[in-house]
Amino acid sequence: MKNKIFYLGLVLILAITGCSNSNEKELIESDEVSGSSSIGLIDDERILSAESEPGNWLAFGRTYDARRFSPLKQINKESVSDLGLVWSKDMGTNRALEATPIVVDGIMFFTSTWSRVYAVEALTGETIWSFDPKVPGEWAKKACCDIVNRGVAVYNGKVYSASLDGRLFALNAETGEKIWEVDTIIDRERSYTITGAPRVAKGKVYIGNGGAEYGVRGYVTAYDSESGDQEWRFFTVPGNPDLGFEDPAMEMAAKTWKGTDWWEFGGGGTVWNSIVYDADFNNIYLGVGNGSPWTREIRSPGGGDNLFLSSIVAVDADTGVYKWHYQTTPEDNWDYTAVQDMALADMEIDGEMKKVLLQAPKNGFFYVIDRTNGKVLRAHPFAAVTWATHVDLETGRPVENPEVDYSDNGAWVLPGPLGAHNWQAMSIDLDSGLAYIPTQENPFFYAVQEDYKKTGIFKWTPGKWNMGIEMSSLAQNILNNLDSQPKPGGFLKAFDPLTGETKWSVPIPHYWNGGVLGTAGGLVFQGDALGMFSAYDKDTGERLWEFNTYTSMLAPPITFEVEGEQYVSILTGSGGGDLFGGEPLPPIEIQALSLIQI
């Protein structure tokens, strides 16, 4: 009998693009309450023991280790051909969905555009409740890369979400009612935004922000998960030294900024994506973003590494006190953020078991870092890299390539500002020792802003992009240098972070594709920009199954199990950084798939 694809239900949720008010009638009012919940009962111990209940997806990266690899294997190489659509849910928007759903005890929690939050039945997609934070529509102009949101945290009967305009909410997981709300933004004269998912651990909620291009100063704040009271705040770049320093780490960092009043430009260093809790060392790892402006000769003309830009910073989970850092791109000059997903693992390196942190950031090198002290152990390129020749493991520093120095005449550089790997999630498979990475090679023609070169004065414009890069003549610069442009492309790669070997690589027609999920069923799932959701053989890269969603994908898939049956789910629809490509954005859905009974 021929396999069937069938719909169990389609729910329409209406919205008006360009403003935040939803036409959908909320099932739950958002008055502040203090009621308890009987669902969403996730605590530290449950996440730490997540391997004992693989049917749930309890945290942003599935576990605190954030490897995004599932032990479920009912859907495997032999059975994946029977995978078919169970339900889809129209989210009523033509903008990107980027969230990682949390699934616990048959209920799925996720976010949509404008920071709206949903709880749905995982088996049917039926809405249980929804919450709209009613972000002012004009806030869209403050967001660098669309009105997106990457998800929620669920903890002790509450759902934690952050809004584009910088508020943090605790919602009753059973009803969606608001329990508390706090304003996380320190200066509303600056264009701060939040698109990232909160993280939870040790009775705290951790959240960062975005807006580096607009001239903000980055920081991460920890709030008490029950009351919403602020527990600590860690700034990632120093402020005005004349006003004193918040802590010794900022005093240390200020010595690496030279020659200008950098604090007037904000400095950047926003933590807009990756925050990881490490129970082994009671650390919180912060993935820190780019400088404001991008160009170092404007930002810090006297030189210096500009800490903690483009760094992984370890702080104490209870106090926020600095422990160590590793800077992936000292003196960042290219928008090479280190906000990309981080994963934790125990790996044998040089004959010794090491507790390591793994990251494949924008700059194109895959870092294996000792979690005890921040020392880099491996740093192999996982994509085409021209800005540096290699990373010196003795010094821990990259060796820059002078042939692509763009300070005088401009130059094509790989990676470009979208990075060799961006926020789209990778998956770490410890059994094979491989990382499955959504990789891209998208060159950019960098040149210093012409007005600055002529006058020596950088005109910072509040509320606008302040990169220090020549953009007004970018198109002409590209046309003038087409002959030397490196070829762009997208790839799904299986990469060995210890040896630097690419085991297999699958080319994908577009470079801006979705996140990745690996499973013990021998599969790697990914959605791509052309609408194809695919399952690959994790050993060879062979495509074993595909499903046309008819809309682009950026979000990472997840998998879960309900009543003994495994499902795969993905939020579909493109946007975010892809808006710069001017591509049409079709309607957006969330979809759930399972093995079809025939």
Task: Give the label of every model feature segment.
Residues K89-T100, S130-A153, E181-A197, F235-S274, ...:
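Extracytoplasmic beta-rich repeat domains
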Residues A66-I185, G518-T519:
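N-terminal cofactor/phosphate-binding cores enriched in small/glycine residues
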Residues W57-G61, A96-R116, K141-R167, T193-Y214, ...:
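Repeat-blade elements of multi-bladed beta-propeller folds
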Residues I207-Y219, G259, L286-N306, E441-Q485, ...:
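Short, conserved, GDST-rich strand-edge loop motifs in beta-rich repeat architectures
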Residues A15-G18:
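C-terminal motif of bacterial Sec signal peptides marking the signal peptidase cleavage site
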Residues I596-I598:
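Conserved small/polar residues in nucleotide/adenosyl-binding loops
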Residues L27-L85, P241-M250, R397-E400, N480-L482, ...:
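Blade/loop signatures of beta-propeller domains
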Residues A122-T124, N172-T175, S225-S227, A317-T319, ...:
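Short loop/turn segments that connect beta-strands within beta-propeller blades
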